[in-house]
């Protein structure tokens, strides 16, 4: 057999073995944390898009959540988009959903309590994400999807998360609640239930939740 053909076969065999190993790791992770499989399966491909480059500026990082929301809405038509797919998107959608259902902010301790059900702990390496705290508190914040800041007058200091300006631009309340409905349909006992509606879309959102996303198509 020609040497070039042998070399290609060896490379193909190595690539196939690597793919098999990656699938085994992901299957193991999902079997240990059933909610993880539910969250990933519940995330539609068009729920969120985002840039691979760093979109944030020092001004964005220092804005209040209210300023971020109004600024994002004003910039909505001109914000560039590119694919932000896969497991990171599922993780981000989980956090955005939690922030929303907790009344537009979520304390860091609660975020990690919920993510713990996905097999993610701060300071502990995850087989898929690596360092989850770095992704959540650095990458998602740097890209403008989350705002991460101290809780006023907390002692010892606590931190909380808000939707960042890019999350307001690239997602929506209905998309996030559609995601929550699908997750709840699989593992409702793992999600908090103290919803705090604050918009004119209450009836439509409640319909999504009550239906468990069966037969409902988000706009």
Swiss-Prot record:
Keyword Phosphoprotein appears in the UniProt entry: yes
Region feature Disordered, mapped onto this chain: 1-84
Gene Ontology terms: cellular component: nucleus
Gene3D superfamilies, sorted: MAGE homology domain, winged helix WH2 motif
Biased composition (Acidic residues): 44-57
Residue ranges occupied by any MAGE domain in the UniProt entry: 1-198
Ranges of Low complexity composition bias in the record: 58-74
Classification via PANTHER family: MELANOMA-ASSOCIATED ANTIGEN H1, MELANOMA-ASSOCIATED ANTIGEN MAGE ANTIGEN
Gene that encodes the chain: MAGEH1
GO biological process, one term: negative regulation of transcription by RNA polymerase II
Residue positions, PTM Phosphotyrosine: 195
SMART domains: MAGE
The name this protein goes by in its record: Melanoma-associated antigen H1
């Amino acid at each position: 057999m020609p040497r070039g053909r042998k070399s290609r076969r060896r490379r193909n065999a190595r690539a196939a073995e690597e793919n098999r190993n990656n699938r085994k790791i992901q299957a193991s992770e999902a079997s240990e944390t059933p909610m993880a499989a539910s969250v990933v399966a519940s995330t539609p491909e068009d729920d969120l898009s985002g840039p691979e480059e760093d979109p944030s500026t020092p001004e964005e990082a220092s804005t209040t959540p209210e300023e971020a929301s109004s600024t994002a809405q004003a910039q909505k038509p001109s914000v560039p988009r590119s694919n932000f797919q896969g497991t990171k998107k599922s993780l981000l959608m989980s956090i955005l959903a939690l922030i929303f259902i907790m009344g537009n902010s979520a304390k860091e301790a609660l975020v990690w309590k919920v993510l713990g059900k996905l097999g993610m702990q701060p300071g502990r390496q995850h087989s898929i994400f690596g360092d989850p705290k770095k992704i959540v508190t650095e990458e998602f914040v740097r890209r403008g999807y989350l705002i991460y800041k101290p809780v006023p007058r907390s002692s010892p200091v606590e931190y909380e998360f808000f939707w960042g300006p890019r999350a307001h631009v690239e997602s929506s309340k209905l998309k996030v609640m559609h995601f929550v409905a699908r997750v709840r349909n699989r593992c409702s006992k793992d999600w908090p239930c103290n919803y705090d509606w604050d918009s004119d879309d209450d009836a439509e959102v409640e319909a999504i939740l009550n239906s468990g996303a069966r037969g409902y198509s988000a706009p």
